Amino acid sequence: MSKLDGKVVVVTGASRGIGKAIAKGMALEGASLAILGRTSSLSDPSELSIERTVQEIKDFGGIAQGYFCDVTEDSSVNSAFLNLREELGSVDVLVNNAGVLARVGFLETSISLWDSIMRTNLDGVYFCTMAVLSEMCRRNSGVIINISSSRGYSDDAQSTAYAVSKAGLDRLTIKLATELLGFGISVNSLQPGLTMTELMAKKNPDLLEMSPKWTEEKNIIPACVWLAAQQGTAVTGQVLDERDFGSTWPIKGISHPTIS
């Protein structure tokens, strides 16, 4: 029996990058995936799309459905979650992955850019989390994984708005976990390592040679699967680094899925 058999998992921002890798990894463990994103092959002819992620999951026998969702608009979020519940059932696991990054210092950050980053990285998490909490509270079970970033605590002079949004996300994680302790819902932040995504590799191939610290998208999968598969709230309200998975936080008895 796979670790996530019978689970319905929603991953936002899953048409590409880390979100896509997480979705495929969850599907390999038996979960039914709702792929949420804004990049559709109908509007963007590129190969990185909701439809492609869904097809790649189905190609290895997994279960997945795709839904257009702009996490910055509550009406779009509510519509996507209404549709996915009708097709896949109640949500067991929510992975808030959708996010935007701008490498701009504070002095160069316009009001519109600030609003755009906060709207996606914080408001989007609020909208999607609110969309699942009622059913999770009724069932007294559920898992919420917020994909964060160590940039929230770095001294990098750039990406100020992004750093603020991710630090805020981690604080939201801690407060929400405390509020939901009596409902059997775990809420954790997970920080990936410095990740070379598929899109970045295509646009900036020279970046791979500039730093030895790049990690692959798929490296976050074991940590995500472990968090999604845990029962109850033994681990909740934590800001976790996926690079420490297996050393400073537990994986006993958990084997790692492989993904191409």
Where would I find each of the regions flagged by the language model?
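Substrate-binding pocket helix/loop in short-chain dehydrogenase/reductase
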Residues: 105-106, 113-115
